[in-house]
Protein backbone atom coordinates (compact mmCIF):
# COMPACT_ATOMS: atom_id res chain seq x y z
CA UNK A 1 0.00 0.00 0.00
CA UNK A 2 2.74 2.40 0.96
CA UNK A 3 4.63 1.42 -2.16
CA UNK A 4 1.63 2.15 -4.22
CA UNK A 5 0.99 5.51 -2.53
CA UNK A 6 4.58 6.72 -2.61
CA UNK A 7 4.98 6.66 -6.34
CA UNK A 8 1.79 8.71 -6.66
CA UNK A 9 3.02 11.24 -4.14
CA UNK A 10 6.48 11.25 -5.64
CA UNK A 11 4.98 11.62 -9.04
CA UNK A 12 2.83 14.43 -7.74
CA UNK A 13 5.75 16.15 -6.02
CA UNK A 14 7.90 15.72 -9.07
CA UNK A 15 5.22 17.12 -11.23
CA UNK A 16 4.88 20.05 -8.89
CA UNK A 17 8.63 20.69 -8.75
CA UNK A 18 9.40 20.18 -12.42
CA UNK A 19 9.24 23.46 -14.31
CA UNK A 20 7.06 23.32 -17.33
CA UNK A 21 5.33 20.11 -16.25
CA UNK A 22 3.42 21.27 -13.20
CA UNK A 23 -0.22 21.85 -12.77
CA UNK A 24 0.17 25.31 -14.18
CA UNK A 25 1.58 23.97 -17.40
CA UNK A 26 -1.11 21.36 -17.48
CA UNK A 27 -3.71 24.10 -17.01
CA UNK A 28 -2.14 26.13 -19.70
CA UNK A 29 -2.10 23.14 -22.00
CA UNK A 30 -5.70 22.39 -21.19
CA UNK A 31 -6.64 25.98 -21.65
CA UNK A 32 -4.72 26.11 -24.90
CA UNK A 33 -6.22 22.84 -26.00
CA UNK A 34 -9.67 23.99 -24.95
CA UNK A 35 -9.15 27.36 -26.52
CA UNK A 36 -9.58 26.44 -30.19
CA UNK A 37 -13.18 25.22 -29.95
CA UNK A 38 -14.05 28.32 -27.97
CA UNK A 39 -12.26 30.40 -30.53
CA UNK A 40 -13.93 28.45 -33.27
CA UNK A 41 -17.23 29.02 -31.56
CA UNK A 42 -16.50 32.68 -31.21
CA UNK A 43 -15.34 32.83 -34.78
CA UNK A 44 -18.53 31.16 -35.94
CA UNK A 45 -20.56 33.42 -33.73
CA UNK A 46 -18.51 36.34 -34.87
CA UNK A 47 -19.24 35.45 -38.48
CA UNK A 48 -22.96 35.34 -37.79
CA UNK A 49 -22.88 38.57 -35.89
CA UNK A 50 -20.80 40.11 -38.63
CA UNK A 51 -23.38 39.09 -41.23
CA UNK A 52 -26.17 40.44 -39.08
CA UNK A 53 -24.27 43.65 -38.52
CA UNK A 54 -23.64 43.96 -42.26
CA UNK A 55 -27.37 43.50 -42.90
CA UNK A 56 -28.12 46.12 -40.28
CA UNK A 57 -25.55 48.44 -41.82
CA UNK A 58 -27.06 47.99 -45.32
CA UNK A 59 -30.54 48.72 -43.99
CA UNK A 60 -29.24 51.73 -42.16
CA UNK A 61 -27.46 53.00 -45.27
CA UNK A 62 -30.66 52.55 -47.28
CA UNK A 63 -32.56 54.49 -44.67
CA UNK A 64 -29.94 57.21 -44.76
CA UNK A 65 -30.16 57.36 -48.55
CA UNK A 66 -33.95 57.50 -48.44
CA UNK A 67 -33.83 60.20 -45.81
CA UNK A 68 -31.35 62.14 -47.90
CA UNK A 69 -33.61 61.85 -50.95
CA UNK A 70 -36.62 63.02 -48.95
CA UNK A 71 -34.67 65.90 -47.50
CA UNK A 72 -33.39 66.92 -50.94
CA UNK A 73 -36.93 66.73 -52.34
CA UNK A 74 -38.25 68.86 -49.49
CA UNK A 75 -35.44 71.34 -50.05
CA UNK A 76 -36.33 71.57 -53.75
CA UNK A 77 -40.00 72.10 -52.90
CA UNK A 78 -39.07 74.82 -50.45
CA UNK A 79 -36.94 76.52 -53.09
CA UNK A 80 -39.80 76.34 -55.58
CA UNK A 81 -42.18 77.68 -52.96
CA UNK A 82 -39.89 80.60 -52.20
CA UNK A 83 -39.35 81.55 -55.84
CA UNK A 84 -42.16 83.77 -57.22
CA UNK A 85 -44.35 82.00 -59.79
CA UNK A 86 -45.46 84.60 -62.36
CA UNK A 87 -48.03 83.72 -65.02
CA UNK A 88 -46.83 84.33 -68.57
CA UNK A 89 -49.05 86.92 -70.26
CA UNK A 90 -48.55 87.68 -73.94
CA UNK A 91 -48.67 91.43 -74.45
CA UNK A 92 -48.39 93.49 -77.58
CA UNK A 93 -45.30 95.53 -78.38
CA UNK A 94 -47.11 98.80 -77.94
CA UNK A 95 -48.21 97.70 -74.48
CA UNK A 96 -44.71 96.60 -73.51
CA UNK A 97 -43.27 99.94 -74.60
CA UNK A 98 -45.59 101.83 -72.27
CA UNK A 99 -44.02 104.11 -69.69
CA UNK A 100 -45.65 102.54 -66.64
CA UNK A 101 -43.94 99.19 -67.33
CA UNK A 102 -40.52 100.82 -67.50
CA UNK A 103 -40.75 102.50 -64.12
CA UNK A 104 -37.76 101.40 -61.97
CA UNK A 105 -39.57 101.52 -58.63
CA UNK A 106 -42.23 98.92 -59.52
CA UNK A 107 -42.37 95.87 -57.28
CA UNK A 108 -43.22 92.35 -58.46
CA UNK A 109 -46.76 92.64 -57.08
CA UNK A 110 -47.35 95.90 -58.92
CA UNK A 111 -45.98 94.43 -62.16
CA UNK A 112 -48.25 91.41 -61.77
CA UNK A 113 -51.24 93.67 -61.19
CA UNK A 114 -50.41 95.73 -64.28
CA UNK A 115 -50.01 92.57 -66.34
CA UNK A 116 -53.42 91.33 -65.22
CA UNK A 117 -54.97 94.65 -66.27
CA UNK A 118 -53.15 94.46 -69.61
CA UNK A 119 -54.49 90.94 -70.11
CA UNK A 120 -58.06 92.22 -69.70
CA UNK A 121 -57.52 94.90 -72.33
CA UNK A 122 -55.58 92.64 -74.70
CA UNK A 123 -56.89 92.56 -78.26
CA UNK A 124 -56.51 88.79 -78.67
CA UNK A 125 -58.54 88.14 -75.53
CA UNK A 126 -61.30 90.45 -76.76
CA UNK A 127 -61.27 88.74 -80.17
CA UNK A 128 -61.65 85.36 -78.52
CA UNK A 129 -64.61 86.61 -76.47
CA UNK A 130 -66.27 88.11 -79.55
CA UNK A 131 -65.78 84.90 -81.52
CA UNK A 132 -67.28 82.84 -78.69
CA UNK A 133 -70.30 85.15 -78.49
CA UNK A 134 -70.76 85.06 -82.27
CA UNK A 135 -70.65 81.25 -82.35
CA UNK A 136 -73.13 81.10 -79.47
CA UNK A 137 -75.53 83.40 -81.33
CA UNK A 138 -75.22 81.34 -84.51
CA UNK A 139 -75.90 78.07 -82.70
CA UNK A 140 -78.86 79.58 -80.87
CA UNK A 141 -80.34 80.99 -84.08
CA UNK A 142 -79.81 77.78 -86.07
CA UNK A 143 -81.84 75.82 -83.51
CA UNK A 144 -84.93 77.98 -84.14
CA UNK A 145 -87.32 76.49 -86.72
CA UNK A 146 -88.30 79.85 -88.28
CA UNK A 147 -84.86 81.00 -89.33
CA UNK A 148 -84.72 82.13 -92.94
CA UNK A 149 -81.41 80.49 -93.79
CA UNK A 150 -82.54 77.14 -92.47
CA UNK A 151 -85.82 77.41 -94.39
CA UNK A 152 -84.04 78.35 -97.60
CA UNK A 153 -81.58 75.49 -97.27
CA UNK A 154 -84.45 73.07 -96.81
CA UNK A 155 -86.20 74.47 -99.89
CA UNK A 156 -83.07 74.32 -102.03
CA UNK A 157 -82.36 70.73 -101.00
CA UNK A 158 -85.96 69.80 -101.74
CA UNK A 159 -85.73 71.38 -105.21
CA UNK A 160 -82.45 69.62 -105.98
CA UNK A 161 -83.87 66.25 -104.98
CA UNK A 162 -87.23 66.68 -106.77
CA UNK A 163 -86.33 68.44 -110.01
CA UNK A 164 -87.83 65.71 -112.21
CA UNK A 165 -91.31 66.18 -110.73
CA UNK A 166 -93.47 68.67 -112.69
CA UNK A 167 -94.94 70.25 -109.57
CA UNK A 168 -94.06 72.68 -106.81
CA UNK A 169 -92.97 71.99 -103.27
CA UNK A 170 -96.36 72.22 -101.61
CA UNK A 171 -97.65 69.52 -103.98
CA UNK A 172 -94.85 67.18 -102.88
CA UNK A 173 -96.27 67.37 -99.40
CA UNK A 174 -99.62 66.15 -100.73
CA UNK A 175 -97.85 63.28 -102.45
CA UNK A 176 -96.13 62.34 -99.21
CA UNK A 177 -99.43 62.38 -97.34
CA UNK A 178 -101.09 60.19 -99.95
CA UNK A 179 -98.10 57.86 -100.34
CA UNK A 180 -99.42 55.46 -97.71
CA UNK A 181 -102.78 55.03 -99.42
CA UNK A 182 -101.14 54.75 -102.86
CA UNK A 183 -98.83 52.00 -101.62
CA UNK A 184 -101.82 50.06 -100.29
CA UNK A 185 -103.63 50.46 -103.61
CA UNK A 186 -100.51 49.44 -105.55
CA UNK A 187 -100.60 46.04 -103.88
CA UNK A 188 -104.03 45.35 -105.42
CA UNK A 189 -103.49 47.12 -108.76
CA UNK A 190 -100.23 46.35 -110.62
CA UNK A 191 -100.06 49.75 -112.32
CA UNK A 192 -101.44 53.02 -111.00
CA UNK A 193 -101.08 56.52 -112.34
CA UNK A 194 -100.13 59.19 -109.80
CA UNK A 195 -102.68 61.96 -110.16
CA UNK A 196 -100.74 64.60 -108.24
CA UNK A 197 -98.16 64.96 -110.98
CA UNK A 198 -100.76 65.54 -113.71
CA UNK A 199 -102.39 68.72 -112.42
CA UNK A 200 -100.94 72.04 -111.49
CA UNK A 201 -102.44 75.40 -110.51
CA UNK A 202 -102.52 78.02 -113.24
CA UNK A 203 -100.65 81.26 -112.58
CA UNK A 204 -101.21 84.52 -114.38
CA UNK A 205 -98.51 87.08 -115.17
CA UNK A 206 -98.60 88.46 -111.62
CA UNK A 207 -97.96 85.04 -110.08
CA UNK A 208 -101.41 84.65 -108.46
CA UNK A 209 -103.18 81.29 -108.46
CA UNK A 210 -106.42 81.49 -110.47
CA UNK A 211 -107.49 77.87 -110.70
CA UNK A 212 -106.51 74.40 -111.81
CA UNK A 213 -105.49 73.57 -115.35
CA UNK A 214 -106.86 70.68 -117.33
CA UNK A 215 -105.11 67.35 -117.30
CA UNK A 216 -104.36 67.55 -121.03
CA UNK A 217 -102.02 70.49 -120.42
CA UNK A 218 -99.82 68.55 -118.00
CA UNK A 219 -99.37 65.30 -119.90
CA UNK A 220 -95.70 65.77 -120.63
CA UNK A 221 -94.63 63.18 -118.08
CA UNK A 222 -96.51 60.10 -116.98
CA UNK A 223 -95.32 58.44 -113.80
CA UNK A 224 -96.33 54.82 -113.31
CA UNK A 225 -95.83 52.99 -110.05
CA UNK A 226 -95.33 49.26 -109.97
CA UNK A 227 -94.36 47.07 -107.03
CA UNK A 228 -90.68 47.85 -106.27
CA UNK A 229 -90.33 49.88 -109.50
CA UNK A 230 -90.65 53.58 -110.31
CA UNK A 231 -89.98 54.87 -113.82
CA UNK A 232 -90.88 57.86 -115.99
CA UNK A 233 -92.29 57.74 -119.51
CA UNK A 234 -91.79 60.77 -121.76
CA UNK A 235 -94.57 61.63 -124.21
CA UNK A 236 -92.91 64.15 -126.50
CA UNK A 237 -89.82 66.36 -126.48
CA UNK A 238 -91.76 69.56 -127.25
CA UNK A 239 -94.06 69.03 -124.30
CA UNK A 240 -91.11 68.32 -122.02
CA UNK A 241 -89.34 71.51 -123.15
CA UNK A 242 -92.48 73.55 -122.55
CA UNK A 243 -92.80 71.99 -119.12
CA UNK A 244 -89.18 72.78 -118.30
CA UNK A 245 -89.68 76.41 -119.27
CA UNK A 246 -92.85 76.57 -117.18
CA UNK A 247 -91.05 74.99 -114.25
CA UNK A 248 -88.28 77.56 -114.50
CA UNK A 249 -90.84 80.35 -114.51
CA UNK A 250 -92.54 78.88 -111.47
CA UNK A 251 -89.21 78.53 -109.66
CA UNK A 252 -88.36 82.15 -110.43
CA UNK A 253 -91.73 83.30 -109.14
CA UNK A 254 -91.34 81.20 -106.03
CA UNK A 255 -87.86 82.57 -105.40
CA UNK A 256 -89.13 86.14 -105.74
CA UNK A 257 -91.98 85.34 -103.39
CA UNK A 258 -89.58 83.85 -100.85
CA UNK A 259 -87.34 86.89 -101.07
CA UNK A 260 -90.29 89.18 -100.42
CA UNK A 261 -91.29 87.00 -97.46
CA UNK A 262 -87.74 87.16 -96.08
CA UNK A 263 -87.74 90.96 -96.37
CA UNK A 264 -91.08 91.12 -94.55
CA UNK A 265 -89.85 88.78 -91.82
CA UNK A 266 -86.69 90.83 -91.39
CA UNK A 267 -88.77 93.99 -91.04
CA UNK A 268 -90.98 92.31 -88.43
CA UNK A 269 -87.90 91.10 -86.56
CA UNK A 270 -86.44 94.59 -86.55
CA UNK A 271 -89.72 96.03 -85.31
CA UNK A 272 -89.83 93.47 -82.49
CA UNK A 273 -86.25 94.14 -81.46
From Swiss-Prot:
Gene: FAM216A
Identification of the protein by name: Protein FAM216A
Pfam families in UniProt: FAM216B
Family: Belongs to the FAM216 family.
Annotated region (Disordered), positions in chain: 1-47
InterPro entries for this protein: FAM216
Residue pairs linked by disulfide bridges in the UniProt entry: none
Amino acid sequence: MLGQLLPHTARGLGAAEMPGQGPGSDWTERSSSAEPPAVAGTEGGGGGSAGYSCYQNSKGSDRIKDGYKVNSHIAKLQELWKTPQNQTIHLSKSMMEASFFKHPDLTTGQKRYLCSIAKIYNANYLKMLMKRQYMHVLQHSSQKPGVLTHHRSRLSSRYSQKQHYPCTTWRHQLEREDSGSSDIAAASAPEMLIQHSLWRPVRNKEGIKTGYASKTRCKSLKIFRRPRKLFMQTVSSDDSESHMSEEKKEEDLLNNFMQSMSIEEQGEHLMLT
